[in-house]
């Protein structure tokens, strides 16, 4: 292989592994249970969060618990974690404290999840497939720390690592957005139907990410 072809190959691999790109109508595929496969979502968040909304789509046939969105900061485990406990139960952790929302659910169905929280009231909201669940409260007056490691596919037990296969995600994740505000009900509906974009912290259509180990990008073929 000549030098030019070699460096073109290296550059292509680099773009595939560490990239900013429009992932509209695509998904990250996590094809196996592991303690290593994950995606690092890269953001320059330098100010603590007083409120936020996270939305994503997921499709998995796992029956056990697993992490959907893991946000850790130095010295703070489960600073912000969206976690599926079991069929029909979703938890939000803020500063190591959690609340759980419950919803009737089919095991093999894709799901759209939006979760929001605001410090002033401590109210956490869950929306599953565009429908609001019972509001819960936690960590009133708290600030979610800045400079996070945001991981898909694994739950962090340290800053950016210490993964457990038994908490890993197997399946497909897409349409990941994060805002530094609580979205209105109308905006959540718009996100669910795919017409509201431009997340201020994470934007699926202009995403900085790093693929680690066995994670593949494929077209999304489900709703």
Swiss-Prot record:
Compartment list: Secreted
Disulfide partners: 55-114
CC terms in the record's Gene Ontology section: extracellular space
Binding site for Ca(2+) 2: 155, 157, 167
Keywords for the protein's UniProt record, in alphabetical order: Acute phase, Amyloid, Calcium, Disulfide bond, Glycoprotein, Metal-binding, Secreted, Signal
GO molecular function: calcium ion binding; complement component C1q complex binding; identical protein binding; virion binding
Protein name: Serum amyloid P-component
Secretion signal span: 1-19
Needed co-factor(s): Ca(2+)
First-listed, main subcellular location of the protein, grouped into a coarse class: secreted
Gene3D superfamilies, sorted: 2.60.120.200
Subunit structure: Homopentamer. Pentraxin (or pentaxin) have a discoid arrangement of 5 non-covalently bound subunits.
One example of a Gene Ontology biological process annotation: acute-phase response
Amino-acid positions noted as binding Ca(2+) 1 in the UniProt annotation, renumbered to this chain: 77-78, 155-157
PANTHER family assigned to the protein according to its UniProt record, in alphabetical order: C-REACTIVE PROTEIN-RELATED, SERUM AMYLOID P-COMPONENT
UniProt domain Pentraxin (PTX): residue ranges: 24-223
Family per record: Belongs to the pentraxin family.
Superkingdom of origin: Eukaryota
């Amino acid at each position: 292989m000549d030098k030019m072809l070699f460096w073109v190959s290296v550059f292509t691999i680099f773009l595939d592994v560490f990239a900013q790109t429009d992932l509209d109508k695509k998904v990250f595929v996590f094809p196996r249970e592991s303690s290593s496969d994950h995606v690092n979502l890269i953001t320059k968040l330098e100010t603590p969060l007083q409120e936020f909304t996270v939305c994503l789509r997921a499709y998995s046939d796992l029956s056990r618990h697993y992490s959907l969105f893991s946000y850790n900061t130095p010295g703070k485990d489960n600073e912000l974690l969206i976690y599926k406990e079991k069929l029909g139960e979703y938890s939000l952790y803020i500063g190591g404290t959690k609340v759980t929302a419950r919803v009737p659910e089919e095991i093999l169905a894709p799901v759209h999840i939006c979760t929001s929280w605001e410090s002033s009231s401590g109210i956490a909201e869950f929306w599953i497939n565009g429908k609001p669940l019972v509001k819960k409260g936690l960590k009133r007056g708290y600030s979610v720390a800045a400079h996070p490691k945001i991981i898909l596919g694994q739950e962090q037990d340290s800053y950016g690592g210490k993964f457990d296969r038994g908490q890993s995600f197997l399946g497909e994740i897409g349409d990941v957005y994060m805002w530094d505000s609580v979205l209105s009900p109308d905006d959540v509906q718009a996100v669910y139907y795919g017409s509201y974009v431009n997340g201020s912290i994470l934007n699926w259509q202009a995403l900085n990410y790093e693929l680690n180990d066995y994670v593949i990008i494929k077209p999304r073929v489900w709703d």
